[in-house]
């Protein structure tokens, strides 16, 4: 499987942010985007995730010689600023996420097994997400993407707010 990007272009008014991006991402490989603040890395992700309308170009998946349009379930996205339902507890959020995605999840584990995997302490599991730290919210965001197991996982500076132990484990 490959994610193919052809002639991607994005402008904000007169400022050209993405100019004729052409690239193929192969399954099983990890790619990194390097650049200064404002270079267009997050804009690139937002275009790919269809959160921003592109000015030109196309992206699609090629699998076994066949091409198809990217579907929303193909992409998981871990934002640099966590986006979680703060009115739920961590446990309620995972339970809800698993329930609405149960037909798509390949191997469902217990909620506590997921918490253990991300090193979320027992005393934090039933706290409201609004009371989680930035790093804890990021863990939850990463966890639902691990559970969903999308074909494409976009990580926008995901490890910056993780504690050192979890960040190192995620790199492995």
Regions found by a protein language model. Give the residues of each.
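Conserved structural motif at the start of ABC-family nucleotide-binding domains
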Residues: 3-5, 18-20, 72
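The feature captures the beta-strand-to-loop junction immediately N-terminal to the Walker
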Residues: 31-36
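Helix-to-loop junction immediately C-terminal to a conserved catalytic motif
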Residues: 49
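Conserved ABC transporter NBD signature motif
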Residues: 56-73
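Q-loop/switch helix immediately C-terminal to the Walker
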Residues: 81, 86-102
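Conserved ABC ATPase "signature" region
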Residues: 95, 106-124
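Catalytic Walker B motif of ABC-type/P-loop ATPase nucleotide-binding domains
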Residues: 153-157, 162
């Amino acid at each position: 499987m490959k994610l193919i990007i052809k002639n991607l272009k994005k402008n904000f008014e007169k400022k050209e942010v993405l100019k004729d991006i052409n690239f193929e991402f192969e399954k099983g490989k990890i790619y990194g985007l390097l650049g200064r603040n404002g270079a267009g890395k997050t804009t690139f992700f937002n275009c790919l995730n269809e959160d921003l309308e592109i000015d030109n170009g196309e992206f699609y998946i090629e699998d076994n010689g066949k091409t198809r349009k990217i579907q929303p379930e193909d992409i998981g996205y871990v934002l640099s600023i966590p986006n979680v339902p703060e009115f739920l507890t961590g446990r309620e959020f995972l339970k809800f996420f698993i329930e609405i995605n149960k037909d798509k999840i390949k191997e469902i584990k217990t909620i506590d097994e997921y918490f253990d995997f991300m090193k979320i302490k027992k005393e934090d599991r039933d706290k409201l997400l609004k009371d989680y730290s930035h790093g804890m919210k990021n863990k939850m965001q990463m966890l639902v993407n691990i559970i969903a197991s999308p074909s494409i996982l976009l990580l926008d500076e995901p490890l910056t707010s993780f504690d050192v132990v979890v960040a190192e484990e995620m790199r492995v």
